[in-house]
Amino acid sequence: MSLLIKNGTIVNDDAIFKSDVLVLDGRIVEIAPSIQPTPGLEVVDATDRLVIPGGIDPHTHMQLPFMGEIAKDDFHRGTEAAVAGGTTMIIDFVIPTKGESLLVAYDRWRGWADPKVVCDYGLSMAITSWGPEIAKEMEIVTGAEYGINSFKFFLAYAGVFMVRDEEFYQGMIQCAKLRALARVHAENGSVIAERCEHLLSSGITGPEGHTQSRPEELEAEATFRACTMASQANCPLYVVHVMSKGAAAAIAHHRKKGAVVFGEPIAAGLATDGSHYYNEDWLHAARYVMSPPLSRDPSTPSALMKLLAAGELHLTATDNCTFDCQQKSLGKDDFTKIPNGVNGVEDRMSVVWDKGVHAGIIDPMRFVAVTSTMAAKIFNCYPQKGRIAVGSDADIVIWNANATRTISKDTHHHAIDFNIFEGMQVHGVPEITISRGRTVWANGQLKTVQGSGQFIPLAPDSQIVFSAVDNRKKAMEPVKIDRIPYEPSALQTPDANANIVVKAPVRAAIPPGGASSIQF
């Protein structure tokens, strides 16, 4: 595929400049102020448009089996929605059932994804059980044959995915040994289970019970706990779906102490809030059920965006895990049975541009960083991904910063019958999406080929993640004090009170602090 992009303004995470871009065989081969077209080249006119790296969504759950259902967006529909929104790579999660081999689960996910994806993808691995065999398989899947460089631990979903603190800690020690990133879903699953039982017994069965069972304090507590444990294990930590100010504050606290912690807010948390859970329409409220829940504080979305601007949160994702209205209705009499998950992979880029750049909170370079480049660096596929540069994959979006669109279930490409951003007008529109040199979205139309995406192996030991770990390890080495051997004499049994000097009481003429003026 030969392609020439003319007259555009390139935006990377560290620079903005006008230039043309030449693409051959799926890679960028030249960037220059004026490249002359040759016969056979497809020419794209990007006048008054931005030329940006394709988005990377580092947190999706396509066709995930969960809560007795299967997420509606499979790897075909989900990646079609992604490219329609300007995202050219996703990182999905292999989630084994309790006790299942990581290798067996990995093969199942690859079998689902490879024939369906229309853009590139990578995989992260969830750890839902612990033991010597799991630790051994973690080492295997971080090899080049499997291409896994991160492991996710759930501190929620008791009895399903949740691991105990000691398992989480041991897992992070193994991650650090393998130079793999630990990722965490931070909620207090034990307390949540108790609260759910209490609320249901109190007659609260609707979606409002979901948010009441998972107050923000439980996300903040679990985030702080996870960061503390990761620091003790000397393991870099990535906190997925940061939904509250308290969780973000916990991350900032530990980073200020030198911990290597990354925070990921998601599109839903940047654009909506938890007021929806109290809507009188049960189905409307149920559509927004996800975990952790959306914040009930209406100022949280703006606060999270400002933390992205300040560098206290680091990249954006979606946790795209879609269930339609019929599936959501399975919990009509019990909020704990509402399948958790929302959409986002199609709308993330526009939502972040609208709430960030258009709102004057971040600049276009920071937009590229939090939607693409930072993910590429953290997951060790930079500069292959996440940059407009010679030698990089031609994952490119022609972005119209001045255009607007209204988000709607009637026009989106998800496999569900609602959209949590319904009716929201957003500034910033991907006009053309290019995946490894192939135009997959143009003029509002998909041009995809099922199975044309590639699996991207992700190698461990990302330098942005692990460059400080070795020095931290040296600083954390245990300190031993060399002492003269202590050998108490067995022949001496001194009286415990023998050396105690007892003084006779003496009345102070003027006690310390001065004499009292109180008269009795």
UniProtKB/Swiss-Prot annotation:
Q: Which UniProt keywords apply?
A: Hydrolase, Metal-binding, Zinc
GO cellular component: a single term = cytosol
Q: Which CDD domains match?
A: D-HYD
Q: Name one GO biological process term.
A: pyrimidine nucleobase catabolic process
Show the InterPro entries listed in the entry: Amidohydro-rel, Hydantoinase/dihydroPyrase, Metal-dep_hydrolase_composite, Metal_Hydrolase, Metallo-dep_Hydrolases_sf
According to the UniProt entry, what is the EC number of this protein? 3.5.2.2
Name the positions where substrate binds: 157, 291, 340
Modified how: Carboxylation allows a single lysine to coordinate two zinc ions.
What binding details are noted for the cofactor? Answer: Binds 2 Zn(2+) ions per subunit.
Per the record, a Pfam family?
Amidohydro_1
Its family remark reads:
Belongs to the metallo-dependent hydrolases superfamily. Hydantoinase/dihydropyrimidinase family.
Protein name per its UniProtKB record: Dihydropyrimidinase 2
Protein source organism: Caenorhabditis elegans
